[in-house]
């Protein structure tokens, strides 16, 4: 199969993509979070093609993307008042809400669960495609399972060339990490996966917001997309350090000395880079100022893809505190590091 990257976002081209989606093909589409691998969310056979392209287990739930809030009504049994508040506050945007599914939604979309994950993206091109397709689009991240999520069309192509017919190129994703996934219950809102909408933002509009136990315990059964299996791993082994730039630079130097002749790659803040640049040789990416979770989120996956291309032996990263958007970034970084994070 030849994979075509669509860069001219004309109505005719978007119609072509929508037609392909509606009739069972898998297409990579842009969102504000990461690129998604889209298929008709009401067609179990089409969703099987997503799992085949990603090499992803079919018991992992998918998110159904819709162009507007009205579109979710046939997909759910009910919309609780708390969910309505969240929709008004954060849609379109990087918030996925799980609700009791209707019989219209195939079990294939939910991984066999009785709740469906729904999101309205804050991305004009994506919503145009959704409108034209006329069906909800199931779309996990458009990468081979276990690899870093893509925030550019080129990163999608590197993983999906020959596996899907089309990639819609709308430039780099503005947020850079996946959506927040929440479950709405009578007693409050549970964050199943941290993402672009923070706990603090949710608490501004609803009461009783908490994190799901699975985020800190691997013994709990996951209820959200992207939380069951290994994710986000670069090719080279990766370690991360969190602390002030001086301590991070010292920790980096100790590891670099241990690695001796091996080639390293370093994801760091501007302040840490200034402390290392004259003495350390390797592949650097500076994401922004120390503690800037927004900048790190934007650059994280893109940088991991770049480091994969550089054929390095190991990766060292400077993390941020687990507050605000930092919770989502560090969740992804911890997975990329296989848990090898040191707080200095």
How does the language model describe each region?
Residues 1-344:
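Active-site-adjacent structural elements in enzyme catalytic cores
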């Amino acid at each position: 199969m030849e994979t075509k990257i669509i860069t001219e976002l004309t109505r005719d081209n978007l119609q072509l993509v929508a037609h392909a989606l509606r009739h069972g093909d898998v297409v990579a589409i842009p969102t504000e979070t990461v690129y998604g691998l889209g298929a008709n969310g009401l067609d179990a056979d089409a969703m099987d093609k997503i799992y085949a392209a990603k090499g992803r287990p079919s018991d992992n739930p998918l998110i159904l993307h819709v162009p507007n809030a009205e579109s979710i009504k046939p997909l759910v049994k009910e919309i609780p008042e708390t969910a309505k508040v969240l929709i008004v506050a954060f849609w379109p945007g990087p918030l996925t809400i799980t609700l009791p599914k209707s019989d219209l939604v195939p079990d294939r979309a939910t991984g066999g669960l009785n709740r469906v994950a729904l999101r309205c993206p804050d991305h004009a091109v994506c919503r145009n495609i959704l409108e034209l397709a006329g069906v909800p689009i199931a779309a996990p991240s458009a990468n081979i399972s276990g690899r870093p999520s893509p925030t550019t069309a080129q990163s999608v192509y590197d993983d999906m060339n020959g596996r899907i017919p089309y990639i819609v190129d709308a430039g780099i994703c503005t947020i850079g990490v996946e959506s927040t996934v929440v479950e709405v219950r009578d007693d409050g809102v549970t964050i199943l996966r941290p993402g672009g909408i923070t706990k603090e933002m949710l608490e501004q509009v609803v009461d009783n917001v908490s994190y799901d136990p699975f985020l800190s315990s691997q013994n709990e059964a996951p209820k959200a997309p992207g939380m069951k299996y290994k994710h986000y791993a670069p090719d080279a082994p990766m370690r991360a350090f969190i602390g002030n730039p001086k301590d991070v630079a010292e920790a980096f130097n100790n590891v670099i000395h241990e690695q001796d002749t091996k080639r390293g790659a370093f994801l760091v803040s501007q302040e840490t880079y200034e402390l290392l640049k004259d003495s350390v040789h390797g592949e650097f990416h500076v994401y922004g100022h120390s503690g800037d979770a927004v900048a790190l989120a934007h650059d994280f996956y893109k940088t991991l893809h770049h480091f994969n291309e550089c054929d390095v032996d190991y990766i060292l990263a400077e993390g941020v505190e687990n507050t605000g958007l930092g919770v989502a970034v560090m969740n992804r970084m911890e997975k990329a590091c296989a848990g090898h994070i040191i707080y200095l």
